[in-house]
């Protein structure tokens, strides 16, 4: 739990680094209320913007009270901005904090000068001070930043919730059978923990006793409860719905699923996309723009009116109204929100550039088995082509060779042989034949399991009519070869996933062409494609063929997304403009791919595209607001419309500046997946 909270803390700091004041977060609320106590007397005892009100709360020496309280307020309430500005200058990245620090410093220093002139100088006339403006300015800035920091924190709320899923303690089953409550940090791999109904599962693990239904909605976004039996994996942070289970711990701390996800999200939030680099650059220039406009406005108004009070007010207002912060946070806040929402729903964004590229995708290429289909095969037909070998003997030979493989087709054959009580042996020297099958020794005889492409390539005879009949029914067909003779075959069917058809329809509605890439035979590939509505099919592919096909499509200027197994399809995922590893489960860190889909649900492909579209829309809105606000507000503050009576005071400027950032934060917070 400590680790997860630390991960969240680090993540939170990372998406606030643009502000230059993340470390003042906890102080803004306290500083605001303490500063309010000092500010109220200043506001009551000072003339409002140089205007003597009908009611005056003054007394002999009250100007000294104002001076002392203003000095305390300047150094106490203004400290976050003064130290923030100092930090920005030290890193040679002056921004919003520097502008605010300049604004309040100019107001304070000039007010000291005015105090001296009014109380110790023999000069006639009254010099207006800015103590009232200084007090309201600091108050508004503190309040604005307090509200803003809350809004910024909420942007990553989904990730914060994930960090809080793990319990602080767990019930450990000791070697003697006794139960003992221990801290999560004391749990080790291979320990046995007991989890009762309704409790949060403390770590990733395997159920060794009991069965239950698990609520993974807060961990992977899976809305339905998942039935779990003995030997099934469970994820730390998910909720045990019913029944007491005992879980053997498989991963703790940094190796746990939640920690991996938060680590990946944290990394993604720290990596800057091209759009963010651009906005950072513009925000950097905005500081110099504001300072130049402020100085020019001061000079111009001095030339026009020869009124130092009014000219200085323009300068201070320009400095406090300019907000590079709104521009600097425009993208990071949306990123924090989108990556958090994605992780909460089992869509882990490892490469943020992919969110921008997703807007321009022309083709989505998908592996058939496991992506479009369940990958849970059933044996529909098996047959011997050799008179002295029975059908069950052929099944036994298939199962013997396949017992060394973890491919879905292999697992299906082994399970089927067991269900038929057909015995099989451990083969020797088993080797994988890439894109074909495998070979090995059984009773000193060499056998090969191949696909139909291998038979055609080596001109081996087989029953073409039987193949066509079974393949058109959607079966994947494997052949058994001994001494370059086909001695048997097995046909296995796979179910199309419920959400595949809708996913294909959604892609087509977005003018994105779905493409099937498969090592399976043409007949099966086209049968599945026809049912799904996919017209672009590439079958009987070797692993390296997928990568070259992607390359061909890209050579025509197309943007290609590849969806496949994060390990077996790694070269293709890397070659594509966006690589999506589907069905990663808890192994989110080991997969290739820009995007990791924890579940094997094809609809998550569309969910990612939707999230990308929504994210980019929010980014554009925030950038327009951040840039547009400054383009309009800075000239107004300089007095561009003073000739029609529109003049902004420093206090109003401070309100607008604070609001500009809060609006950006709130807009980011309204980002949704759907």
Swiss-Prot record:
Catalytic activity, reaction form: Cu(+)(in) + ATP + H2O = Cu(+)(out) + ADP + phosphate + H(+)
Top-level lineage group: Bacteria
Residues engaged in binding Mg(2+): 565, 569
GO BP annotation list: copper ion homeostasis
Main enzyme class: translocase
Pfam families xref list: E1-E2_ATPase, Hydrolase
Alphabetic keyword roster: ATP-binding, Cell membrane, Copper, Copper transport, Ion transport, Magnesium, Membrane, Metal-binding, Nucleotide-binding, Phosphoprotein, Translocase, Transmembrane, Transmembrane helix, Transport
One GO MF term attached to the UniProt entry: P-type monovalent copper transporter activity
Basic and acidic residues: compositionally biased ranges: 7-16
Chain segments annotated as transmembrane: 32-52, 57-77, 95-115, 127-147, 284-304, 315-335, 623-645, 649-671
CDD domains reported for this sequence: P-type_ATPase_Cu-like
Keyword DNA-binding included in the entry's annotation: no
PROSITE patterns, alphabetized: ATPASE_E1_E2 (PS00154)
Membrane topology: Multi-pass membrane protein
Entry GO terms, CC: plasma membrane
Keyword Cell membrane: yes
UniProt similarity note: Belongs to the cation transport ATPase (P-type) (TC 3.A.3) family. Type IB subfamily.
Identification of the protein by name: Probable copper-transporting P-type ATPase B
Organism: Staphylococcus epidermidis (strain ATCC 12228 / FDA PCI 1200)
């Amino acid at each position: 739990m400590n680790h997860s909270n630390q991960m969240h803390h680090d993540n939170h700091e990372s998406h606030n680094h643009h502000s230059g004041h993340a470390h003042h977060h906890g102080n803004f609320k306290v500083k605001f209320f303490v500063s309010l106590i000092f500010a109220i007397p200043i506001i009551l005892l000072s003339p409002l913007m140089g205007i003597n009100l009908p009611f005056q709360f003054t007394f002999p020496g009250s100007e000294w009270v104002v001076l002392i309280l203003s000095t305390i307020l300047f150094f106490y309430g203004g400290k976050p901005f003064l130290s923030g500005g100092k930090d920005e200058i030290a890193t040679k990245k002056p921004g919003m904090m520097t502008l605010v620090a300049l604004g309040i410093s100019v107001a304070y220093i000039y007010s000291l000068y005015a105090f001296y002139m009014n109380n110790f100088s023999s000069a006639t006339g009254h010099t207006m001070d800015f103590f009232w403006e200084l007090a309201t300015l600091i108050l508004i800035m503190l309040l604005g930043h307090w509200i803003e920091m809350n809004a910024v924190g909420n942007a990553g709320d989904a990730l914060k919730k994930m960090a809080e899923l793990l319990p602080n303690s767990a019930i450990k089953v000791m070697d003697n059978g006794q139960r003992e409550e221990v801290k999560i940090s004391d749990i080790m791999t291979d320990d046995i923990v007991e989890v009762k109904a309704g409790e949060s599962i403390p770590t990733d693990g395997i159920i060794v006793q009991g069965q239950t239904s698990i609520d993974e909605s807060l961990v992977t976004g899976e809305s339905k409860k998942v039935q779990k039996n003995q030997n099934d994996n469970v994820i730390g942070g998910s909720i045990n719905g019913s029944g007491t289970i005992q879980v053997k711990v498989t991963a703790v701390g940094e190796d746990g699923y939640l920690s991996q996800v938060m680590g990946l999200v944290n990394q993604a939030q720290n990596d800057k996309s091209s759009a963010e680099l651009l906005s950072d650059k513009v925000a950097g220039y905005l500081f110099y723009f504001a300072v130049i406009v402020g100085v020019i406005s001061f000079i111009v108004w001095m030339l026009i009116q020869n009124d130092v009070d009014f000219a200085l007010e323009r300068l201070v207002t320009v400095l406090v109204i300019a907000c590079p912060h709104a521009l600097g946070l425009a993208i990071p806040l949306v990123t924090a929100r989108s990556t958090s929402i994605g992780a909460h729903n089992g869509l882990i964004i490892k490469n943020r550039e992919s969110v921008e590229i997703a807007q321009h995708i022309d083709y989505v290429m998908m592996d058939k088995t496991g992506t479009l289909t369940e990958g849970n095969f059933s044996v529909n037909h098996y047959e011997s082509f050799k008179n002295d070998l029975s059908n069950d003997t052929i099944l036994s030979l298939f199962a013997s060779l396949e017992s060394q493989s973890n491919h879905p087709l292999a697992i299906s054959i082994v399970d089927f042989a067991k269900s038929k009580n057909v015995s099989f042996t451990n083969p020797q020297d088993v080797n994988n034949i890439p894109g074909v099958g495998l070979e090995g020794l059984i009773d000193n005889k060499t056998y090969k399991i191949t696909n139909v492409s291998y038979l055609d390539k080596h001109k081996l005879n087989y029953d073409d009519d039987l193949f066509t009949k079974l393949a058109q029914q959607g079966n994947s067909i494997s052949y058994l070869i001994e001494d370059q003779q086909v001695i048997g075959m097995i046909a296995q069917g796979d179910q199309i996933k419920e959400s595949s058809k809708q996913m294909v329809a959604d892609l087509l509605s977005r003018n994105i062409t779905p493409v099937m890439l498969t090592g399976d035979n043409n007949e099966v590939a086209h049968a599945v494609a026809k049912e799904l509505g996919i017209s672009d099919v590439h079958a009987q592919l070797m692993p390296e063929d997928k990568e070259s096909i992607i390359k061909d499509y890209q050579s025509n200027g197309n943007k290609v997304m590849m969806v496949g197994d994060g390990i077996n399809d790694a070269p293709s995922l890397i070659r594509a403009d966006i690589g999506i590893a589907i069905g990663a489960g808890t192994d989110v860190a080991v997969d290739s791919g820009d995007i990791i889909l924890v579940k094997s649900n094809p609809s998550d492909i569309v969910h990612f595209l939707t999230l990308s579209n929504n994210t980019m829309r929010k980014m554009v809105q925030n950038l327009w607001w951040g840039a547009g606000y400054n383009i309009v507000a800075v000239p107004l503050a300089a007095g561009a419309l003073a000739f029609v009576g529109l003049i902004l005071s420093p206090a109003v400027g401070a309100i607008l500046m604070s609001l500009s950032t809060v609006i950006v934060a709130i807009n980011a917070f309204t980002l949704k997946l759907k």
